[in-house]
């Protein structure tokens, strides 16, 4: 089978275009096989006796993350909660600028939002976010200051289910629940016709119907990230939506733009809002890459940011993207 030769063949057998701007408004649809469900016997997570302690909740489910690394991440409750009432944790890190402008004022920090475990059964996505928190903390300076915001586990209910689940506690695929154009029409049709009502891809009863997707939507509206990094597994590719020239690789992951779905984060952020969205698909949902690969992906991301997003002191930053930005051509 082709899927055995290339995991990406399972992800995007073909892209169907509807022509002109209608394709952008409705989303570029993909016919996809059901997402692989990682099969593994996992330890039962710690009881929720200390709801403000992220490590007490998540540590037993984090591949390649020990107690020391988890504690060092210093995750704190954001104030928002999942559908089942679990805290949504985050961590902000500020990397200072190495230089100032000629006028003696530092450029405004670049805002970067890193999100893991949108799908609760993609455990390595949360672990990678925690590893990257450690790397961000060690950074001395960058050419422009960077305000990092990490949300390692957006879907804690799926992440901590007895068997980790792609969907949240109400059975909703959070990555199909964002308010993209014509969602009410296109998301149900896509789910019924393209996925054959795959329960792992149910978009929900309405856009932003879930507390977790509402929280992320609020972050994108108030934090106004100039880059969103969305971490997934296990297709082993790099995807990109939105303005700017995309990175060609992060570590071993090579760019292969797979299109957007009704209600997806890439569609909402990259196409509709004009925020660059880098989507990382790790090779495995349960096994972390080697440390050298984790560092290589991070270094490649920083190099791309330096080349495409950061601004030299003598070069004024471009105007912010309009909220209704659309790319000039359809993918």
Model-predicted regions and their roles:
Residues 37-49, 315-331:
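Compositionally biased, proline/threonine/alanine/serine-rich low-complexity intrinsically disordered stretches
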Residues 109, 113, 122-258:
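Active-site/substrate-binding loop(s) of hydrolase catalytic cores
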Residues 90-108:
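Short beta-strand-to-loop junctions in surface cap/lid or active-site-entrance loops
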Residues 237-241, 249-250, 262-323:
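Active-site-adjacent mobile loop/cap segments within catalytic or ligand-binding domains
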Residues 45-46, 111-116:
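Acidic/histidine-rich, surface-exposed loop or edge segments in extracytoplasmic proteins
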Residues 27-29, 36-91:
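Short glycine- and acidic-rich boundary segments immediately preceding or forming the N-terminal edge
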Residues 15-34:
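Sec-dependent N-terminal signal peptides
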């Amino acid at each position: 089978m082709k899927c055995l030769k290339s995991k990406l063949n399972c992800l995007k057998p073909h892209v169907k275009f509807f022509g002109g701007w209608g394709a952008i408004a409705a989303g570029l649809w993909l016919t996809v096989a059901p997402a692989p469900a990682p099969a593994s016997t996992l330890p039962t997570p710690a009881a929720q006796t200390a709801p403000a302690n992220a490590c007490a909740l998540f540590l037993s489910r984090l591949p390649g993350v020990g107690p020391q690394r988890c504690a060092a991440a210093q995750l704190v409750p954001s104030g928002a909660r999942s559908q089942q009432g679990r805290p949504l944790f985050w961590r902000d890190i500020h990397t200072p600028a190495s230089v100032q402008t000629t006028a003696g004022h530092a450029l405004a920090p670049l805002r970067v939002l890193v999100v893991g475990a949108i799908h609760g059964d993609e455990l390595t996505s949360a672990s990678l976010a925690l590893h990257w928190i450690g790397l961000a903390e060690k950074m001395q300076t960058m050419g422009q200051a960077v305000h990092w915001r990490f949300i390692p586990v957006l879907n804690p209910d799926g992440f901590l289910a007895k068997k980790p689940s792609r969907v949240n506690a109400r059975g909703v695929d959070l990555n199909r629940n964002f308010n993209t154009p014509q969602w009410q029409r296109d998301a149900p049709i896509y789910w019924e016709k393209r996925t054959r009502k795959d329960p792992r891809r149910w978009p929900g009863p309405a856009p932003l119907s879930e507390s977790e997707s509402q929280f992320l939507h609020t972050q994108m509206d108030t934090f106004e990230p100039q880059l969103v990094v969305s971490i997934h597994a296990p297709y082993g590719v790099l995807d990109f939506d939105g303005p700017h020239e995309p990175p060609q690789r992060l570590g071993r992951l090579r760019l292969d733009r797979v299109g957007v779905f009704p209600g997806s984060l890439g569609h909402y952020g990259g196409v509709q809002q004009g925020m660059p969205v880098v989507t990382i698909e790790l090779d495995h949902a349960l096994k972390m890459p080697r440390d050298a690969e984790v560092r290589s992906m991070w270094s490649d991301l920083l190099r791309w940011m330096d080349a495409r997003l950061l601004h030299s002191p003598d070069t004024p930053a471009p105007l912010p993207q309009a909220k209704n930005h659309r790319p000039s051509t359809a993918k």
